Amino acid sequence: MRTLALALTLVLSLSISVPARAAVDETNAHRLNALGLFLGTGSGYDLGGSATRLHGIIMLTRMLGEEDAALSFDGPCPFSDVAAGKPSAYTGYAFAQGYTTGVSATTFNPGGALSFKHYVTFLLRALGYDDGAGDFTFAASLDKASADCILQKQYALYRGDLVDLSVSALMTPLADGSATLAESLAKKGVFTWEEGRAQGLIGGGQEAYVHSSLRNTGAPKPEQSAS
């Protein structure tokens, strides 16, 4: 399945030291920040912090070049556990576009841990793969990677992982092969071609995501089935 091949491109498990991991995270955070795709927390990037489901939706809308549309969304948000304002706009927009179904019909669990499987599912959608049309399924999106010990998919995602996966996805071709995700964002005017090239995300080849199990020293985090 093309989706599994893409997942294997995005997720490559290698041994990497904590200092080296932190340096990669910081570099990639700067690259995304320069393009307006990743913002700090007010006291830095907090790359060692856990990524939440709301973080995943925000990053997805940016990766699709649709953040302005999300922030101006004035339709209903079906999730009673999402705060009013920007969180409601992001999640309401994502639901309306079919990017998320929540964890139930009325809850999204915005502060819940974002798993590798959830975020790679979001990235696959950003790349033009449609699980609704059978291009892939949430349940199978990382099964091959897990079976090959490429990814311990039961662990939650850290913000540094979110950044690194996003950089890899930006350099990955869209499902229709017309361009990379970064090139498509440049065409939409999210950033310029020159800015994309300056950050090495356009014309620089592809960078595989490197997962370090050293981050995941705690107990496994259970996943929720919906996305």
Short names for language-model regions:
Residues 1-28, 34-89, 97-117, 124-157, ...:
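Feature responds to low-complexity, polar/acidic, surface-exposed segments characteristic
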